[in-house]
Amino acid sequence: MVTGIGFCLPGQGGRPVLTADDLWNVASRGASCLMKDDVYFGSVDLSDAMFDERLPGIPPFFSRHYTAAHRFGLVSLVEACADAELDPRSGDLSDAAILVGRGGVDANIDSYLSVLRADPETIQAAEAMELFIAAEQAVTPSDVALVQGALTCSKGPNFTVSAGCASSAVQIGIARRMIACGEVDVAVVTGVDVFSVKLIRNIQNLLRGAQNTYDAIRSDDMPSLLPSFDSLMRPYDRRADCINHGEGSVTIVMESREHASRRGAHLYGQVLNQATTRDGLANPLACEETGSELVAAVRRCLGDRVGIDQVPYVHGGSDGNVVVTAFEANAVTELYGSGARDLLMSSQEGCFGHNGAPAGCLGVALTLLMMEHGEVCPTANCEEPADNLTFDPVPGVRTRPLDFDYALSFNYQVGGVKSAILLGSPDV
């Protein structure tokens, strides 16, 4: 059961998205929190005061070395715990699994280079100790899991999974299996990533002159155009030609039904299954457009328990990449047949930017909120649906009424990795 959701995502008006109400206010309107400065990007404007208000008392010896990833991951965790009415500092999570998904390494680079460039012959002892603490906390992908484990004083499983943009989706599957087999009663899953705007700008400049060379080496299973970041992302729109990135963190609290019932927790819904597949190509950067392995992941999730005709909504994973839209459309046709035209399938990546590892947790949180509200959020920035869509992308800026008990949420990783999560209302 999902009993708590918390966020540290780009917002509007200088305030991050932190709570379920904040998230719904943005997603239900199809609003975009992306800002343009050479490239479009979703920034989390988390002030020191906001952080200190939610996380007082952390020893400065550790906190002054926190990266943005640490800060975002800790804030989304305490927001999710507050939503679930659990106190991470009073032992409520002492036996919980604290699981983190991380896709990128941008937040780790500065600490890594600081140690690499330090001169042991001239550095002072106190400065050397500061570098050591910063490095221990920040140079590996386990950075956020380390500080979350410390905050909660957890004695349970505590580790990081890196599967690109499917990282937290994979961790949700692991958490579900841990709870189902009785290993833990509570699992807290966070997806967090930070993307360097400087790096994105430099990539954009490098790629501007590289298209002709790329045309000469590309294979049929690679997109015809190199990525672009300088126009607004429009998933499922006929004008889609760009991907925008964003930073941030999303945390969900998962519990066994018995544990949640004993303490009278609010139930958003449940994670019924999760499956991961790969396209099987020899090219490490490509994916195929038939969607066959996405179909396989969905069918593993459904099993004999749920029929596809019982799933009227899918939270799509499109980031504006036309290849992603193509394999999603083909997969939907294979799964739903003539019923595909009635399927509602939307993406809110245009609200916050493509944020990597948080996407799995964000998809679950958004979908369960839609289920609870009985409304499907529109696809952000989609105004003119693409011609090749086999489903209804819910264009515009208004929600669509839908009473539903089952849904799917999709996430992908570069190289053809596909994740599908089957979600249900609390009582199914």
What is each residue range found by the language model?
Residues R102-F159, Q204-P223, V324-S338:
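Active-site-proximal gating segment of KS-fold condensing enzymes and close homologs
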Residues H65-H70, G91-L93, A128-T140, F159-S168, ...:
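Active-site nucleophile and cofactor-binding loops and adjacent substrate-binding regions
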Residues G4-G6, L99-G101, S162, A187-D193, ...:
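Short beta-strand segments
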Residues C165-A180, C242-G246, V250-A265, D279-V428:
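Claisen-condensing/thiolase-fold acyl-transfer catalytic domains that form or cleave C-C bonds
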Residues M35-L86, S90, V100-I109, T140-K155:
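A glycine- and small-residue-enriched flexible loop/hinge segment at structural boundaries
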Residues M1-Q12, P16, A20-N25, A31-D37, ...:
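Condensing-enzyme catalytic core mediating Claisen C-C bond formation in acyl metabolism
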Residues R54-F61, I123-A134, L151-V161, S231-R238, ...:
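Glycine/charged-rich beta-loop-alpha catalytic/anionic-binding loops adjacent to active sites
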Residues P120-F132, G173, V192-H259, V397-L402:
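Glycine-/small-residue-rich "gating" segment that lines the acyl/pantetheine channel
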